[in-house]
Amino acid sequence: MLRTRLIQAASSAQRAFSTSQKALAAKQMTVRDALNSALDDELARDDRVFILGEEVAQYDGAYKVSRGLWKKYGDKRVIDTPITEMGFAGIAVGAAMAGLRPVCEFMTWNFSMQAIDHIINSAAKTFYMSAGAVNVPIVFRGPNGAASGVAAQHSQCFAAWYAHCPGLKVLSPYDAEDARGLLKSAIRDPDPVVFLENELVYGTAFPVADNVADKDFLVPIGKAKVMRPGKDITLVAHSKAVETSLLAAAELAKKGIEAEVINLRSIRPLDTATIFASVRKTHHLVTVENGWPQHGVGAEICARIMEDQTFFELDAPVWRCAGVDVPMPYAKTLEAHALPRVQDLVEATLKVLGGKVGKAAAANK
């Protein structure tokens, strides 16, 4: 029943979206269309690529990410599966070992717990255990993290979970450019990739450059992007927390504080070079994520800073702005308070800057 509710909720919550061809002709692109067009490109480019998962074919996907692809490519390239994540993830990993390039969709990453043995013990470790003889070129993708009103068992962020495991690459796109370019790179990659999308931005349209529509447009794995330059403090985020960071940076600008916002894009490998370069410039850092704080992505960034000479560039301790350390509440008001808000991030920034707030504002006038 819960899966049925998720499908119905996804269907009713959809904003207007177009086919791949229309999306690629636009100056703006939704994340849903970006993912759809990336899948279309790679299915057309390489006949080893195929998609499998629950409702991905005739229903066009629970969130319509695979819309039109079953009609275009048929039953052998876009495959509906039974409700058994362990079963179809195992099929996908075996197919990858045999030389195909599966894209395995989870209706939500929370359901990947049913398939975690195949992801961690089979996909991630086979290249190492075979001494490099067997690649596992597979993409596991689907919505990750907090959605809206789906409570504790369907709102977890798995970025830190999977980034802990050697042998996996873990990507967390934010906007349409990220989604299209990173998914194409993931499908072409020789290693298993965990691709963590966010349901809440599927229908959001982002401005895109003309080259994003190119068939070979790729976003490199392991490279972060500076979304907003600044000189007073660095805000490092991934997925929807990038939006929170950009909004907070706009509020901070009203106070005369210039925050630099970094979109990680890639959780493993982690682009420490971009983070370190920014911290050497701003001398202050706040990490932002919707996942839990303990052993999270922000905690790893803090550790990397501590282990590098960049630590000596800090003028104040690093601050983590993360989800509250509790299972996600169902009540809407409590749910809103369980995730970092713009005001939370503004307050964290002011605490890190401390007495330098007035000086920064004066210097930036």
Curated annotation (Swiss-Prot):
Annotated GO MF terms: metal ion binding; pyruvate dehydrogenase (acetyl-transferring) activity
Catalysed reaction, written as an equation: N(6)-[(R)-lipoyl]-L-lysyl-[protein] + pyruvate + H(+) = N(6)-[(R)-S(8)-acetyldihydrolipoyl]-L-lysyl-[protein] + CO2
InterPro entries tied to this protein: PDHB_mito-type, THDP-binding, Transketo_C/PFOR_II, Transketolase-like_Pyr-bd, Transketolase_C
Statement: the UniProt record of this protein carries the keyword Cell membrane: no
Pfam hit, one: Transket_pyr
Any one GO CC term of the record: mitochondrial matrix
Transit peptide range per the UniProt entry: 1-24
SUPFAM superfamilies given in the database record: Thiamin diphosphate-binding fold (THDP-binding), TK C-terminal domain-like
Alphabetized UniProt keyword annotations: Metal-binding, Mitochondrion, Oxidoreductase, Potassium, Pyruvate, Thiamine pyrophosphate, Transit peptide
EC number per UniProt: 1.2.4.1
Any one biological process term the GO annotation gives: pyruvate decarboxylation to acetyl-CoA
Disruption outcome: RNAi-mediated knockdown in neurons reduces life span of adult flies and results in locomotor defects at both larval and adult stages accompanied by abnormal morphology of motor neuron terminals at neuromuscular junctions and mitochondrial fragmentation in brains. RNAi-mediated knockdown in eye disks induces morphologically aberrant rough eye phenotype in adults and aberrant photoreceptor axon targeting.
Tissue: Expressed in salivary glands (at protein level).
EC category name: oxidoreductase
Name listed for the protein in its UniProt record: Pyruvate dehydrogenase E1 component subunit beta, mitochondrial
Lineage: Eukaryota, Metazoa, Ecdysozoa, Arthropoda, Hexapoda
